[in-house]
């Protein structure tokens, strides 16, 4: 599989609400760096837990890959996510509002698995669209 396909597989899984796809895409010992996360470096289990919460809060979540670039063992992906907050997000009740969020991911792929990820997305913009900031 070409390295850009790993991110497409992950996003297709999220669009179906299937976070378990992560087990086929990420190495079990991968490290995930996400801006604004209380834990700057998440394990795969921590990442899946976080993403499960997002998928539950935005059950109609749809992510579109806008651009991808590969170089060596890395793939950069620019994405846009759209979804309606129809369930609680952590301890915050659902707002019923739709959001559009932009983000960037840089994955390093080794032996067919993502071993490290750097992810940046507009968390403040999402909070503003939800009326929470």
Residue ranges and their predicted role:
Residues 1-133:
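C-terminal and inter-domain tail/linker signature
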